[in-house]
Amino acid sequence: MTTTTDELVSYEDALASYDPVMGLEVHVELGTKTKMFCGCSTELGAEPNSQTCPTCLGMPGALPVVNAIGVESAIKIGLALHCEIAEWCRFARKNYFYPDMPKNFQTSQYDEPIAFNGYLDVQLEDGEVFRVEIERAHMEEDTGKSTHVGGATGRIHGASHSLLDYNRAGIPLIEIVTKPIEGAGERAPEVAKAYVAELRELIRALGVSEARMEMGQMRCDVNLSLRPHGREKFGTRSETKNVNSLRSVERAARFEIQRHAAVLNSGGTIIQETRHFHEDTGSTTSGRVKEEAEDYRYFPEPDLVPVAPSRAWVEELRAGLPEQPLARRNRLREEWGVNAHDMQSILNAGAIDPIVATIEAGADAASARKWWMGELARSANESGKALEDLPITPAQVARVAQLVVAGELNDKLARQVIEGVLAGEGTPDEVVEKRGLKVVSDEGALTAAVDEAIAGNPGVADKIRGGKVAAAGALVGAVMKATRGQADAARVKELILEKLGVSEG
């Protein structure tokens, strides 16, 4: 009996017979200065294996101590997810052997998590709100990092050897596990993407992690199964591990729906396994047979005391929670006058905070959105960077917008100014000065350029006089060319129509 197939059914055919059921497990690296159970630094970019100690390497006799900031961050996340916070919880040893786990067990939580029974409301692109229920959020430590050398895929299969860096081993993690997500139907992949995006915004708003997926600070495991319409029992699930972008979460879920349906339609059986997602093809491949909880032989961690957060502390943390991201977006959407689809695009681009900061620096909302979602988003895509990593500040973007409003720059010149700032040529004002980019505001010079354009294009001028006002665009273009794009196009058009005795209406 087949358990896999290289063939896929269409997405529509898959949904014609089956309902998708998802479970999402999101791992977030907490932004503490030291590791979860020792004093080693968590700073990125250090020499391999330079941020380790006997505790995070699992040496005999080394005793762990719980990072209080890690516990506080976990409680904040639980509260923001509307979870119940445990009055008493403890750590457990998750036992398995793998080179990136030097202790041969991971310190995690099993049946007593720090937070449980919550939910997160997520908004889809058409504005519909879907509630994702949270099973639990628990604390654990990250593993080391394996780099497989010599293989074609960068994975262990076919590699000649592997390099191990234990700097990451012991970094605080919180794992957020959803309850089975049912009822999303054809929108299941979209719901998965929206959930991870919403969770990322929430984590950032709390200030407990930068949640940079491209840097591995936030990773998602996509569990998916199918069940025939009308049946209550869940199907066998697969788990696509460590998906590291919003788009990939959606693509992985969609691919697995099609793959599962193809196997089931051919009379095959889905095996419970982990799978790897491939960005280049949008497909998944088999990893290993998925273990059950009992395979890890969990037992209470004897070297750590239980965690018992006081109710007063929990309520103090609750009182300090920021505005929920969805509520904030709805408020900003009203203030900015944008629809739900556009707001979702802004969210997916990671542009909300830069736009807000640009408005606070003096730009109007429309200009701030235009530059961050236009020229700067294009630059980020071309360079493979996040918007926040571009070498330009919200204050500098606001200054460009102010120069446009003041009539000192037009959009074309403003784009050149932004290009100069991104290239390291200085502040917007310095780039304007160096490149000589100010709009031609001398009426005499503009009038002369307009006269020259009319004289050089008599046929176009006659059309305009005859009532074809749209033809003025050709003369505006001629003037802009003559002034090297440094004229105010709107003022040029006004002068052309005045010269030809034609009104705009």
Swiss-Prot record:
Keywords: ATP-binding, Ligase, Nucleotide-binding, Protein biosynthesis
Pfam families: GatB_N, GatB_Yqey
GO biological process: glutaminyl-tRNAGln biosynthesis via transamidation; translation
InterPro entries: Asn/Gln-tRNA_amidoTrfase_suB/E, Asn/Gln-tRNA_Trfase_suB/E_cat, Asn/Gln_amidotransferase, Asn/Gln_tRNA_amidoTrase-B-like, GatB, GatB_Yqey_C_2, Gln-tRNA_amidoTrfase_suB_CS, Gln_synth/guanido_kin_cat_dom
Broad class of enzyme this protein falls into: ligase
Highest taxon above the source species: Bacteria
E.C. code: 6.3.5.-
Molecular-function annotations in GO: asparaginyl-tRNA synthase (glutamine-hydrolyzing) activity; ATP binding; glutaminyl-tRNA synthase (glutamine-hydrolyzing) activity
Subunit and partners: Heterotrimer of A, B and C subunits.
Entries under NCBIfam families matching the protein: gatB, PRK05477.1-2, PRK05477.1-3, PRK05477.1-4
Function: Allows the formation of correctly charged Asn-tRNA(Asn) or Gln-tRNA(Gln) through the transamidation of misacylated Asp-tRNA(Asn) or Glu-tRNA(Gln) in organisms which lack either or both of asparaginyl-tRNA or glutaminyl-tRNA synthetases. The reaction takes place in the presence of glutamine and ATP through an activated phospho-Asp-tRNA(Asn) or phospho-Glu-tRNA(Gln).
UniProt similarity note: Belongs to the GatB/GatE family. GatB subfamily.
Identification of the protein by name: Aspartyl/glutamyl-tRNA(Asn/Gln) amidotransferase subunit B
Name of the gene encoding the protein in the UniProt record: gatB
